């Protein structure tokens, strides 16, 4: 299917498996949101992006009353995170969100948050849903009339009982996203479009490959295809948890390899978070290309509010952990940089290409510029 067919089918409302007619989504993104929702005839627009935010507040009893974990060490670590979150949301994170809101202009079509919008770790369905609602409405109030979309992160579905936390997410988020997109969102994997471009949201917690394959099929011919996923598609360079990527925990790599090949043949751009880092990876293989941009808004201390590259270049990928895990992927890497920086991001999209400006902390000028296409 070529791009002209994709556009014709989009206008006819024949794409968007999980959210219904894509034409409805496009109309809500372009035609019913006032000046900021005005469609650009030349296909040029911007997307404001926030990485993990881990919304929380003090005292920890506000959201975490009744929370416990059967593993005392793990619970102690989680409670350290509560304290970290409360401290950063008392000052730094509101400044970061305010800075992100200032990046919105008349060409901005979407605000995207990469998942882990909340800390999670609540004691039940309603508590998880309330925390999600409070976080979403906080960001929505700051960003104004521009549609806000998020994907499911591991913290968004983590609680005293993960099954109840996930139920809380399902209770709140699909309905709230339906309001943002102007059409029904039924599940955690869904697609919508902005003009000639396809956006496919993927739940990495419980991958539904068959649904994702259908979404890829139904959006063939898009100018650009963006994969919105909380975790990366490729392993990230860290001292631990490097296997926290799409299908990275599977003992059998067949599903991982199959989906990576499908993504590569579509030349997708992956917009993700999870690792609390600002990382750019451009990879060629499997008959195509995957460009991955990992983003972070966990401004945990003063140092993460500045941009400082820790590793870059082909040999830099995996250099921090030193794990053999990266040997499989390194030959396809054509561009790479890694920083433990937090901030906000502005993605600019046009026929000429795609770029992202990164604003560390609440800086008024770009700290880094990434060319994705």
Predicted segments with their positions:
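N-terminal export signals
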Residues: 5-28
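N-terminal active-site segment of His-dependent metallophosphoesterases
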Residues: 28-126
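Short, solvent-exposed loop/turn elements at domain surfaces
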Residues: 45-47, 55-61, 209-212, 301-304, ...
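Residue-level marker for buried hydrophobic side chains located in beta-strands
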Residues: 47-49, 113, 150, 227, ...
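Active-site glycine-centered loops adjacent to acidic/histidine catalytic or metal-binding residues
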Residues: 52, 115-116, 153-154, 230, ...
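Short acidic, glycine-rich surface-loop motifs adjacent to enzyme active sites
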Residues: 221-242
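Histidine-centered catalytic micro-motifs
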Residues: 228-233, 270-278
């Amino acid at each position: 299917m070529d791009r002209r067919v994709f556009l014709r089918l989009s206008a006819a409302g024949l794409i968007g498996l999980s959210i219904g007619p894509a034409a409805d989504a496009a109309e809500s993104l372009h035609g019913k949101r006032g000046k900021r929702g005005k469609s650009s005839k030349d296909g040029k627009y911007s997307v404001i992006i926030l990485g993990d935010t881990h919304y929380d507040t003090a005292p920890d009893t506000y959201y975490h009353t009744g929370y416990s974990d059967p593993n005392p060490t793990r619970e102690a670590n989680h409670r350290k995170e509560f304290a970290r979150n409360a401290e950063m949301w008392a000052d730094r994170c509101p400044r970061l969100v305010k800075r992100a809101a200032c990046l919105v202009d008349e060409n901005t079509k979407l605000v995207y948050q990469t998942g882990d919008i909340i800390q999670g770790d609540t004691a039940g369905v309603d508590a998880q849903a309330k925390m999600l609602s409070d976080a979403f409405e906080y960001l929505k109030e700051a960003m104004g009339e521009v549609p806000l979309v998020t994907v499911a992160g591991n913290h968004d579905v983590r609680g005293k009982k993960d099954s109840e936390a996930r139920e809380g997410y399902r209770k709140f988020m699909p309905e709230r996203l339906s309001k943002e997109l102007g059409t029904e969102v039924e599940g955690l994997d869904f697609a919508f479009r902005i003009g000639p471009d396809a956006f496919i949201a993927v739940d990495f917690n419980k991958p539904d490959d068959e649904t994702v394959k259908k979404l890829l099929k139904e959006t063939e011919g898009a100018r650009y295809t963006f994969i919105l996923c909380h975790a990366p598609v490729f392993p990230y360079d860290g001292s631990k948890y490097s296997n926290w990527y799409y299908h990275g925990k599977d003992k059998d790599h067949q599903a991982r390899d199959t989906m990576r090949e499908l993504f590569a043949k579509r030349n997708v751009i992956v917009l993700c978070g999870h690792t609390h880092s600002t990382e750019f990876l451009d990879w060629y293989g499997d008959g195509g290309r995957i460009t991955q941009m990992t983003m972070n808004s966990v401004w945990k201390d003063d140092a993460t509010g500045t941009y400082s590259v820790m590793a870059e270049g082909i040999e830099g990928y995996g250099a921090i952990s030193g794990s053999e895990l990266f040997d499989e992927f390194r030959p396809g890497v054509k561009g790479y940089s890694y920083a433990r920086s937090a901030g906000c991001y502005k993605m600019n999209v046009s026929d000429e290409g795609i770029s992202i400006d990164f604003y560390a902390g609440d800086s008024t000028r770009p700290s880094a510029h990434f060319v994705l296409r």
